[in-house]
C-alpha cells in the first residue's frame, strides 16, 4: 500500500470519526443553515463581554476565525443577540434555539453542522477553528 493510500485511509477514517461525533465535545448534526456552502455565525451579547470566559472572549475578538472562513470561500457573521439581521440566511439562523451565549453555528450542507456554545478555556480559538475545519 502506498503512502498516499495510507494517508487517504487515515483522513477518511478521521472524517468518519468526526462526523459520527466520536471526538469529545464535538457533535456534528445536519447543517442548520439550508444554503449551499460554509456559513459560520456567532451570536453574542456584546454587553456581557466583560463576564464571558477568557477563551470565549478571545474567539469573539480574534480575526483568525473570520479569515479562515473567508479563505475557505465561506461566509461569516457575528451578531448581537438583540440585533437580528434582516438578510437571509442569517435571520433564520438567529431564530434557532440556543441555550447560552456566546453561541456558535457552523453549517455546510452535505458535510454537516455544529450548534453549541463558543469553545471556552485555553485553546478556544484552536477548538473553534477545528470545528470549522471539520465542516469545510
Regions found by a protein language model. Name each.
Residues 38, 87-108, 114-115:
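Structural micro-motif
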Residues 3, 15, 105-106:
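Domain-start "cap" segments at the beginnings of catalytic or binding domains
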Residues 44-55, 84-85, 111-123:
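Short acidic, S/G/P-rich loop/turn micro-motifs used as interaction or catalytic elements
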Residues 21-75:
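Local sequence-structure signature of Cys/Sec-based thiol-disulfide redox active-site neighborhoods
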Residues 106-136:
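Non-catalytic, surface beta->alpha helical segment in thiol-disulfide oxidoreductase systems
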Residues 2-9:
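Sec-dependent signal peptide recognition
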Residues 10-26:
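Bacterial Sec-dependent signal peptides at the C-terminal "C-region" and cleavage site
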Residues 19, 68-98:
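Surface-exposed substrate-engagement region within the catalytic domains
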